[in-house]
């Protein structure tokens, strides 16, 4: 079987390639060239491509480069900026996995004669049959600290059926040990912690460089709608933020809502950060073909958080037909839920599906 492995230049993808070689697959390495050449705005990718080439040489496999810069710019970077314009806080990695890393990448791999693709993601794929329907299920990785299934919840059945995650049963420590034993140059390379195209995790720098004219100063308001100050622009704030507000209220205040239509930022007390429910759109269901009635789930609205108990309710239109949107009702109010982020639904360590948080019903906000 011919497998095209995405080599990012990091240790995880390098070990994924090595494991597949050891298992007898016909492996080729590819690096997705994603970042446009705009000096001073985006991160540089040159070193990553060079490191990936060195890894491929060490493993004795061919290395190629897929130039995806144009599509990445329109589908991910432009999306990222537009979401901020709309007052939301996007998760570009969530969209990128669906459209680029397992979308465009898979399409090109199949055109080039490969049977499957593989990456260094920490997650598991399980083939099974549910109610007479063959399904490819997505599960959390063994290493809970490194599990990345949250970012993969938009993957379709076709994408899952054509993908391999060799690291699903490995800890990060074991991966580094394998890389060291194999003499790979990136065995101790630090993990990437931020969005791939954002230097130093400085979102506003990228947004201001690409769309500074789209943002204006506006009003800070309290949860009753009273003006209490002036903000610098919506791009500087995110739900739950406390620092940098420059508001003296006599008690700590946090960003609890952003409204692009009125160009206002609502601030409130800690208890006003909590949400009763959310509406998720662009929902993808993995566990079964459809969900047509309310079910009990666990949900994550941020990557680094514990799963929380909730009800998942499919929404229907006036003709009682599915809208593709779902309501999530938290059993206990959830803190700092942000529009634009990913909501991912779980049962045990299986991913039911996920979508984009479209709206949030917060406690005590007009």
From Swiss-Prot:
Keywords, ordered alphabetically = ATP-binding, Cytoplasm, Disulfide bond, Nucleotide-binding, RNA-binding, Transferase, tRNA processing, tRNA-binding
Which cysteine pairs make disulfide bonds?
96-196
Which amino acid positions bind ATP, per UniProt?
A: 6-13, 32, 120
Looking at the UniProt record, the site noted as Interaction with tRNA sits at: 121, 341
Question: What are the subcellular locations of this protein?
Answer: Cytoplasm
Task: Please state the Enzyme Commission number of this protein.
Answer: 2.8.1.13
Is the Repeat keyword given for this protein?
A: no
Q: Which family does it belong to?
A: Belongs to the MnmA/TRMU family.
Please describe what this protein does. Catalyzes the 2-thiolation of uridine at the wobble position (U34) of tRNA, leading to the formation of s(2)U34.
Task: Indicate what this protein is called per its UniProt record.
Answer: tRNA-specific 2-thiouridylase MnmA
Identify the species of origin: Treponema denticola (strain ATCC 35405 / DSM 14222 / CIP 103919 / JCM 8153 / KCTC 15104)
Encoding gene, per UniProt annotation? mnmA
């Amino acid at each position: 079987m011919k497998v095209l492995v995405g080599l990012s230049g990091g240790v995880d993808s390098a070990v994924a390639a090595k494991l597949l070689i050891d298992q007898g697959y016909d492996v080729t390495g590819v690096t997705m060239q994603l970042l446009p050449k705009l000096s001073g705005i985006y991160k540089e990718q040159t070193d990553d491509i060079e490191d990936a080439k060195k890894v491929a040489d060490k493993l004795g496999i061919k290395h190629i480069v897929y130039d995806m810069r144009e599509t990445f710019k329109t589908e991910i970077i432009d999306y990222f900026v537009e979401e901020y314009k709309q007052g939301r806080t996007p998760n570009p990695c969530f969209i990128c996995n669906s459209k680029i890393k397992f979308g465009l990448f898979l399409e090109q791999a199949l055109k080039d004669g490969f049977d499957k693709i593989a990456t260094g993601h920490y997650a598991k794929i399980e083939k099974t049959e549910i109610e007479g329907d063959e399904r490819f299920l997505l599960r959390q990785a063994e290493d809970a600290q490194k599990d990345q299934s949250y970012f993969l919840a938009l993957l379709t059945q076709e994408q899952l059926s054509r993908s391999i995650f060799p690291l699903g049963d490995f800890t990060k420590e074991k991966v580094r040990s394998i890389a060291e034993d194999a003499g790979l140059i990136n065995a101790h390379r630090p993990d990437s912690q931020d969005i791939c195209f954002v230097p130093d995790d400085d979102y506003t720098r990228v947004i201001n460089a690409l769309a500074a004219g789209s943002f204006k100063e506006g009003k800070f308001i309290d949860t009753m709608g009273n003006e209490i100050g002036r903000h610098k622009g919506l791009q500087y704030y995110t739900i739950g933020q406390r620092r940098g507000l420059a508001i003296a209220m006599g008690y700590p205040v946090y960003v609890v809502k952003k409204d692009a239509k009125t160009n206002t930022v609502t601030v409130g007390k800690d208890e006003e950060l909590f949400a009763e429910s959310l509406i998720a759109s662009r929902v993808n269901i993995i566990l079964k073909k459809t969900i047509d009635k309310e079910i009990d789930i666990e949900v994550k609205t941020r990557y680094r958080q514990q799963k929380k108990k909730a009800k998942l309710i499919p929404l229907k239109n006036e003709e009682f037909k599915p809208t593709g949107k779902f309501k999530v009702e938290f059993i206990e109010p959830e803190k700092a839920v942000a529009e634009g982020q990913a909501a991912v639904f779980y049962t045990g360590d299986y991913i039911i599906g996920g979508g984009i948080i479209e709206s949030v019903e917060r406690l005590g906000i007009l």
